[in-house]
Amino acid sequence: MRLARTIGTVTLVEPHASMRGGALRLLVPLGPADLAAGDGAAEPLVAWDDLGAGDGQLVAFSEGGEAAQPFRPADKPVDAYVAALIDRLDIAGTTGTTRHPTATRNVGKNR
């Protein structure tokens, strides 16, 4: 599982029938340096989100075959899945703690 920040929503004109009940979110993965700076510079990716993450939300996501595991035995065409909404992340370092407040959760907005 990795950490990312949501930066947008991907809208489909005609989604696959199994893609109802959630949203495709655009994520920027965050590495250790990105977390310390509070920003990410990695290439964005698209992830399935049925938790209702809002723009700017810090999330944990999984990729590959593991991303489809929550939907077994049903098939869902996903390669990345938002597995958790992060309320707060404290990073201990030599200068103290960096806190990452997250955006207000948009419950139901993307459902």
Question: What residues fall within each predicted segment?
Answer:
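C-terminal structural segments of small proteins and small subunits
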Residues: 60, 66-103
